[in-house]
Amino acid sequence: MIYYTDGSCTGNGKVSNAGGFGIVELTDDGAFVSAYAKRSVDTTNNREELKAILRVMLTAGTKVNQDWNQPSIVYSDSAYCVNTFNDWMFRWAKNNWIKSDKKIPENLDLIKAYYEHYMKGYRIDLRKVKGHNGVKWNEVVDKLATGKISVEEVNKIYG
């Protein structure tokens, strides 16, 4: 399976802001399967994107010992999120969840949840996609994350 994720927030990091994330699920050959979106308050765009990726990991992560089944490919336009889950979290875990600047990583609850699932042997193939560059499904999840289109509308258009 292939997934596109995006997170968004208006008033990023400010009190009583509005944010959300969107996910689109596709078959391996790119056919639309489903869409999902969730709205939040008092959040950040990074937190929402991490939540989207974590949701895919928890619902579609593949056990490594099932080598007959390739991990789902997950596209995100957030370098922060891709680097966090593909690289940085391993260093932070070795340092008792302290970054090189001696600070605790932001969104540690989400990062630890992903890491724990990873350590149980679950995997996704998380890849960076360039944002706001005309990539069809990345544009759709951006609209889901910002609330500019509903899950129902996406399902009606592409389902």
Describe these PLM feature segments.
Residues 8-14, 55-140, 144:
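RNase H catalytic domain
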Residues 1-47, 51, 58-63, 142, ...:
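RNase H-like nuclease fold core
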